[in-house]
Each structure stands twice: as C-alpha cells, then as structure tokens.
Amino acid sequence: MKLDISVKYLLKSLIPILIILTVFYLGWKDNQENARMFYAFIGCIISAITFPFSMRIIQKMVIRFTGKEFWQKDFFTNPVGGSLTAIFELFCFVISVPVVAIYLIFILCKALSGK
C-alpha cells in the first residue's frame, strides 16, 4: 500500500491538529507543575506529527475493504453529520503513533523480504 500524500492534504489536516494542540497547550500552560500534563503535551506533539500519515493509512485500509461507494453515501458526506468526521479525525489522532509504527514495520519487513 503506497501513501500518496499531497501538500493540499497536509494543509487540510493541519486544521484539526492545530485545534487539538491549542487545547492541550492551554491546559498545560495553566498547570505547568503537573508532570502528567507535560507528558500528555509531548505525546500530543508526537501524535500531531504522525496524524496526517495515520489518517491516510486508515483511509486507504478502510477503502480497500469497504469500497469507495460506501464512503460517498449521504451519511458521511452530509455537512450536518460533520460530527462523524470530527470523531473519525479524533480517533485517527489518538491512535496515530501505533498505526504509523505498524505501517513502518510492515514496509520494513516487505523491503527486507524483497517483495
């Protein structure tokens, strides 16, 4: 599975990243003595870096199994149901580090096996 990430896609994925980073930064700024909040903020930064790749990997995998027609239904494209898109983006943000790590291991194993 090849990732084709364009500049437009990266810029589009910056919007949710900036929102989540801002929320975490404001929480950390108010309570800088809390070590857990500092580590959560560092984890948030790492997830922000891997988020666009994670979202693309998940989209490619889901489209492979369900087909493109499934994602073009009114349930997913209706602007009123935009909360579903927000939930999907938050899900991708939370699991971005493990997804990218698994993808990199998969690519490395594939390259080492010579296929």
UniProtKB/Swiss-Prot annotation:
It is a multi-pass membrane protein. Coiled coil: none annotated. Its main location: membrane. It is found in: Cell membrane. InterPro entries: Microcin. Disulfide bonds: none annotated. The chain crosses the membrane at residues 7-27, 38-58, 87-107. The keyword Thylakoid does not apply. It comes from the Bacteria. This is Colicin-Ib immunity protein. It comes from Escherichia coli.
